[in-house]
């Protein structure tokens, strides 16, 4: 008995479904009767077809600075009215919508005019949705590669205004007019729509503006487009970690070149190593930035600034080494060099030279030596210095040395010596002269080395000052490069 009751119910449902299919088939036959997809859905030839153009942004895939192009994944939203596709739902079983292949109905052929790959087709030809009043909505997805003029001045602390221009490829403004879509409250939607649940964030860029505007040309009344302005700002963390921080560390190495003693022999090696490393970084960046002469990226400016400083560090190191290895045999030290680099600058550069030797103690008054002078006697002049005395005895001379000194430094103009002492005195005077010359040589050579150390320290502080001020000025300038309040140019 239960089976006998179920069969009529099943047959009734099948009959209703068959009738519904028949109604939809009848509706399709009705709307496509005498339908021509090549004819605009206008009642009169001079009537313009109003097409609403909107866009849902799904993903900013990439921005190629080298090729100056923006790759995005979007859903283009188009809506218009085609009275030829209207029907009365009551006559067709209450059907409120109809899905039709886009190839079977008229479409406004809206395309991305500034595409960069020559592909004007959509990624997928989805069906259009038709309402009983003839309203047609179409949301085809697309992977667009649009041209984007890259402003490289503040790269990588930059923002870019990449526009996407949509217009009808074959129809002018007198046949098809483009307008912004409207929301449920009837208000125009003048920006690209983003659904947070489906939008994919980009790891390198963040969207700041996504407004749209209808543009027309006063010189061409048939021109009309809807342009979406995507203002995107770069996230510079990658470049800070991989480029800027290494450059700063290399600059610090170049600073320590001036702290390295010239005798170490590695000043030039370290300077040239830093210069070559910065050159490699510059070559790596050359593959990233666009080949344009309209501007120089700020990161390239910083690299050039750093390379200039490192180049000067090489030059300054050569100067320091040249000063360090000078000697009295090759160079004479001018008085102004002594005054500036030995007596004046060191106290301002935090350099203190070891204390000089303590001066000799004052000797007691010389003894009076009297003797009888003859015409044929040998006379010698009083020595002008005491360098014939041993150096260790300068401060504590023994009595014999003092007696000899008093004997030689008597008040008389000359002393009569026996002939057997003439050769001994001559040898002593020769030794004293040689010791004096050697001490003068060593003193002047040490003065040149001290001048080299002072110049090295001067270059160190100068390099630190220029590096700090230059780095701060460059990156503070980039810090003020903020996206505009309005995206429209």
UniProtKB/Swiss-Prot annotation:
Glycans are attached at residues 135, 161. Residues 21-235 are extracellular. Disulfide bonds join 148-162. Pentamer of two alpha chains, and one each of the beta, delta, and gamma (in immature muscle) or epsilon (in mature muscle) chains. Residues 1-20 form the signal peptide. This is Acetylcholine receptor subunit beta. It is found in: Postsynaptic cell membrane; Cell membrane. Residues 324-457 are cytoplasmic. After binding acetylcholine, the AChR responds by an extensive change in conformation that affects all subunits and leads to opening of an ion-conducting channel across the plasma membrane. The gene is chrnb1. Keywords: Cell membrane, Disulfide bond, Glycoprotein, Ion channel, Ion transport, Ligand-gated ion channel, Membrane, Postsynaptic cell membrane, Receptor, Signal, Synapse, Transmembrane, Transmembrane helix, Transport. Belongs to the ligand-gated ion channel (TC 1.A.9) family. Acetylcholine receptor (TC 1.A.9.1) subfamily. Beta-1/CHRNB1 sub-subfamily. One of its GO terms (molecular function) is acetylcholine-gated monoatomic cation-selective channel activity. NCBIfam families: LIC (TIGR00860). It catalyses: K(+)(in) = K(+)(out); Na(+)(in) = Na(+)(out). The keyword Transmembrane applies. Its main location: membrane. The chain crosses the membrane at residues 236-260, 268-286, 302-323, 458-476. GO terms for cellular component: acetylcholine-gated channel complex; neuron projection; plasma membrane; postsynaptic membrane; synapse. The keyword Ion transport applies. One of its GO terms (biological process) is membrane depolarization. It is a multi-pass membrane protein. It holds the Pfam family Neur_chan_memb.
